[in-house]
Every structure is written in C-alpha cells, then in structure tokens.
Amino acid sequence: MGMTVVIILVFSFFVAIVTAETSPYIIHMDLSAKPLPFSDHRSWFSTTLTSVITNRKPKIIYAYTDSVHGFSAVLTNSELQRLKHKPGYVSFTKDLPVKLHTTFSPKFIGLNSTSGTWPVSNYGAGIVIGIIDTGIWPDSPSFHDDGVGSVPSKWKGACEFNSSSLCNKKLIGAKVFNKGLFANNPDLRETKIGQYSSPYDTIGHGTHVAAIAAGNHVKNASYFSYAQGTASGIAPHAHLAIYKAAWEEGIYSSDVIAAIDQAIRDGVHVISLSLGLSFEDDDDNDGFGLENDPIAVASFAAIQKGVFVVTSGGNDGPYYWSLINGAPWIMTVGAGTIGRQFQGTLTFGNRVSFSFPSLFPGEFPSVQFPVTYIESGSVENKTLANRIVVCNENINIGSKLHQIRSTGAAAVVLITDKLLEEQDTIKFQFPVAFIGSKHRETIESYASSNKNNATAKLEFRKTVIGTKPAPEVGTYSSRGPFTSFPQILKPDILAPGTLILSAWPSVEQITGTRALPLFSGFNLLTGTSMAAPHVAGVAALIKQVHPNWSPSAIKSAIMTTALTLDNPLAVGAGHVSTNKVLNPGLIYDTTPQDFINFLCHEAKQSRKLINIITRSNISDACKKPSPYLNYPSIIAYFTSDQSSPKIFKRTLTNVGEAKRSYIVRVRGLKGLNVVVEPKKLMFSEKNEKLSYTVRLESPRGLQENVVYGLVSWVDEDEAEFEVSCSVVATSLVQES
C-alpha cells in the first residue's frame, strides 16, 4: 500500500510540473479599457497580471507604450487562459525567436563626393539612424565623428557603455535589451563581466550593418587586401543609435519590440532591422498573420510617428513565398551583387592560366609548385607534401580537403561546377582553387603529358571591378509574394548584399585556425542583412533634404527611381539608385490611416491586427474601408478560369516643378490587356494630387506563372522624369 501511495505522489508531482510549465508571452491590451483609478498603464498591467498569477510572484518583462500597447510576461497556459477574460485583453503572441539575415557599394548605387546626392544631402547630417541588432564595436574608425555635426537638440537617447566617452557625435546612443533573453533562458548566467549588460558587439553582425548605413570614411580599409580602398557608409555624416537586442544565445520578439519602443521614444528618424521571424512556431500563437509579427506591429507605430522602417527580406531564396518582413508600411529589401569579384589565379607550367573565386586570407608564395593529379579515390599513402593537388569533381570536397591538408600539401585545385551558391563560403582557411569542369581536358592533358614535371603557381588577393552581370539578385535573397499579406507586391527594392565590406570588431577572430587566428577591422559578409542598411542610409539622405516627407514618400522616391531589372517578385522595383531619389518628380504618398482603411477592406483577415495597431475596435477604426492602397507597385492574382478584370487606383503627388505634364508608358505585361486612364496627367501646382486607374485583363489566361512590366509616367516636355510603377500578374498559389 505504501508503495502505491509513493507512485501516486510521484505521478501527481510530475503532472504538476507539466501543467505548470511557463513560457514568455507578449500581451496586447486595449488602452481605452484602462480603469480610471490607475494612474498609468504599467500599474494597470501589473495589477492585471497579479490577478491571474496566484502561486508565484508576477513579473512584467517589458511594458510597451510607443511601439505597441501591452506587456510581456512569463505565464503558464492556465494563467494565459485566465488573462484572456480580463478587461482590455486583445490578443497574445508567444515570445517567438527571431533570426539575423546574415568600399565599393556607395559608388555602385551612384554616390560620389563631387556632385549629386551626397553633397546635396550633406552626407545625411543631422539624421539619426537606429540599428536594432547585436550591438556595436565603438572603437572602430568607422564610428569616429570627424566631420559629423552636433547631436540633434531633440535627441533623448542614452549611452550605456561603462564609459560614456565611447559615444560621440557619430555614435550618440547605445542601449541593451536582454529581459526577453533571460525570460526564455532562465538558467543563463554571465560567464564574463558585462557579457549581457554592455552594448559592445561580440558577434560582429551589428557593427557590420551599422557601418554600412552610416559608417564614416576610413582610408585603406580591406579584408586581408581584398576590396582595398576607402570604406564609407551610405550616410557617413548621419548619427547612429544602437539598440542591442540580438544575442548569441537567441533573439526574442519581446526584446525587439522593446528596442523599437525605445528608438521611437528617443527620436530616431530611420530604423534598420536586419532580422525577422520565420513563423515556424505559429501554432503557439493566436492564429497566423501580421498580428503575430513583432516587427510588423511595432513598426506601424513607428511610421505613425514619421519614422522610416527598413528591413531585410530574408535569405531563403530563390523560392517564391519565402520572403518575410513584408508588411505594407515597411520597406522590404532584397539583396544583389555589385559587379565586384574577389579572385585568385592558377597558372600551370605551360603558362595556361585560370581565374577562380577566392577570399583566401593568408600569405602564399608566388612560385611554381610540383603538381599531383588525383582522378579519384583515397589520398592515403600518397606523397603530397609541398605539392599542389588537383582533384576531380567526384571527390567529396569536405572530407578530401581535410585529408589532403593533413598530408602537408601546399594547396588544392578542385575541378568542379558545384560551387556553393553563397560566395561567402569561399572563405577557406586553406588555399583552394575551384576551376570549372569545362577546363578539365586542358588540365588533364597537361598533367598527363608532364606526369613527373607538372608545376603550377597560385596567386591570391585580387579584386576585379566591373564584372557582369551586375547588379543581379542573389540566389539566397528571398522572393515574394509575402505569405502573411500577399495583396502587396514584395520585396520593394534590391540593394547591394553580396560580399559587402564593412566594419568588424577587431578583437573577434574573423578566420584562421585556433593555432593561427586571424583578425581584421573589416569583414566581407553576404545577405539581405547587408542590403537593408544600404537603403536605411539612402532614406537618411532623403530625410535630410526633405525633412517633412512621410515614410511613404521616402519609400516612393526610392522605388520609382530604381534601376528596373527583372521579376519584381525577386527584385522589387529594381536596384536602388541615388541619382534621382532627391528629386523624383512625383511620389505615391500614403498616410497611416490609408493603411488602416486598406486593412479594413480585408477585415476578415486583418481584424486582430487592426485592433492591435489602432488600439480600437473594428467599428471605430473601419469607417472608411478602401479596396485600394496608394502603393508604388501593383500585384494582381489570376486563376486559370478567371477572366474578370482587375482594377487598381493610384494617386500621384507633384513634388517637382509647379507646372508639368506626364504621359503614360506601359512596358512588358505580355498577354495582358492593360488600360490606363487617363493617359495624361497635367499638374498645375506643386503638391497637387492627380489620380489614375490601371485595368488588367487576362482574356486567354496568363502565358506564364508570373508576368511583369511597368506603368511609367514620363514628363512630356523634357523627359527628365520617369516615375515607374512595377506591375505583376500571377497565377501563383501559396502552398498550404
């Protein structure tokens, strides 16, 4: 009997543990429901939380006031269920993990110091760019304040380094957000002093993206002599505010929201986020959609305050529906190449040479080495020391490379077409040359005819400018449509993202081995993470010249002046260009209320989102629902049996000369009947608004899954302006 009792008690204890399992949640509240006796929102949130937690001390992780209205807290499932019945409760989101999207680029997008956007915008002087990432390495010369103006008088931020002297006129704020990290990892402890309390960047990602957006000019920058030159951010005289919310152990929604909340309060003009959700854990939330995306929800509050928000679109390409961060009010950025390659040269003893991609950082003697050619099989029992080993493509690259290296070989040549997609992966610590299989016969012929006397020489650290095609979208760059809101064409724009040189923590090992670590103050990284801060910098330049322009106006100027390239589901409006962004002629402007009106038209899908971002109920928020959003691009969905036309309305605002006429020009859109009315827009004054409609019809069905083109407005007098709107017609259906 005693044994039975023990078993029951143990089982009961186990059940108690399971049912009492806690998780951090983000709770959205309706502030209009706050009872009068409470003096502030935090005290109301705290009392509400206390009323549902009975067996432990309740604790609010964050109370949000600017980006969203609500709080984050650790709750059991039963406590969460009780909270749902409390006055003011709107919805919850589990504190989901977030992931990072991991010299020449300013010139590549049209910036130069003698004329154009840089001098006109005073290099972004007076504009504050907020970077939400892994922190910053303040000692980097990219963050010196030479030539940077005074800190803006309205700035409210703080510098949380141990020494405030680490901040200056360039780096004007740095703050840490780690409460969500600790709530999700309660056993986490600091293993070194200041590990989780300092804005110092020990990962490198945040330093890299901050310097892309607004790093100062640094001469003689390079990655081990690759990409050598003067490094500069896109807005080198803008100020930087750093919000460290990303950690090696994880990134959490609650910390990201708190960082956006603080950035709005501090007074930033631009927010750059090179991170985002994957929604892999949507079963833990109240449904699937934008309402569960912390960046989407919090950034809406930012644009309401006039803050421009730019995000990376993700690195899960080249597949359709892989894009993230696609809320209509966010600028979503894809990544492309910049016409620059890093190479090595392989020269055989017969003087036949081959170029190959390489970022080998070490020194390598420029002399002829004896060559051993291996057709296949093991390298064991072969004398390879101080030789260049040439292997065929049927060799397993990873394991054989390790074996060959252990033999003391000087270098390896791999004859293969299986180059890894992201060029970042050519950062081998051992000298390796990838040569295409089309050259196999030439190499085999030389090696076989000179079996005992074949030699070769390898040379590294070569940078080649002007390679084609460029710009070209990276295969890794995520493609639209955006799963959570496919009604808007995404991404918005393409920017440089492949092997971008930028600042790096000089004490963090960048490559090499444990025995021979290598360090550098600059690094070459690839990803949409690198593309987003390019656009953040461009937005800062525009904001400096047009301080009263809305976030939508800035977005429009960037999109309508882009260099059109390819499928907009991959490149958006095209590649960012700064040649005309300060004077686009016409803009598509949109107010926060316009976004709400459009969401209201999609009320079935967006009801909870509307409630969260408007802090009111549907009937109050949705008095003027609209099927149209004045966006600088168009996407239309057609099914195989659908012939009814799709109609879109757009409104252009004249920001150019007072009197100017524009005529419409339609390009592409093969197989579609396209009617634009009117065909001419005649503006008589500055800031005048004129509207037009686009009618798309597919009488015989789409010839391809994706058909695209442009509707452009060209001024008829001087052809100085061409204001382009990308248009996509598609039969793509999202997989369930």
Curated annotation (Swiss-Prot):
Gene3D superfamilies membership: 2.60.40.2310, 3.50.30.30, Peptidase S8 propeptide/proteinase inhibitor I9, Peptidase S8/S53 domain
Start and end residues of each Inhibitor I9 domain: 25-101
EC number of this enzyme: 3.4.21.-
Protein name (Swiss-Prot/TrEMBL): Subtilisin-like protease SBT1.9
GO BP, one annotated term: proteolysis
Active-site residues annotated for this sequence: D133 (charge relay system), H205 (charge relay system), S529 (charge relay system)
Protein keywords: Autocatalytic cleavage, Glycoprotein, Hydrolase, Protease, Secreted, Serine protease, Signal, Zymogen
GO cellular component: extracellular region
Domain of life: Eukaryota
Keyword Flavoprotein: no
Domain PA: from-to ranges: 367-441
Taxon lineage: Eukaryota, Viridiplantae, Streptophyta, Embryophyta, Tracheophyta
InterPro entries: Peptidase_S8/S53_dom (IPR000209), Peptidase_S8/S53_dom_sf (IPR036852), Peptidase_S8_Asp-AS (IPR023827), Peptidase_S8_Ser-AS (IPR023828), Peptidase_S8_subtilisin-rel (IPR015500), Peptidases_S8_3 (IPR034197), S8pro/Inhibitor_I9 (IPR010259), S8pro/Inhibitor_I9_sf (IPR037045)
Residue ranges occupied by any Peptidase S8 domain in the UniProt entry: 103-582
Compartmental location: Secreted
Gene Ontology MF term list: serine-type endopeptidase activity
Residue positions assigned to the propeptide: 21-101
Family: Belongs to the peptidase S8 family.
Glycosylation sites: N112, N162, N220, N381, N453, N617
Family matches, as Pfam families: fn3_6 (PF17766), Inhibitor_I9 (PF05922), Peptidase_S8 (PF00082)
Signal peptide bounds: 1-20
Organism encoding this protein: Arabidopsis thaliana (Mouse-ear cress)
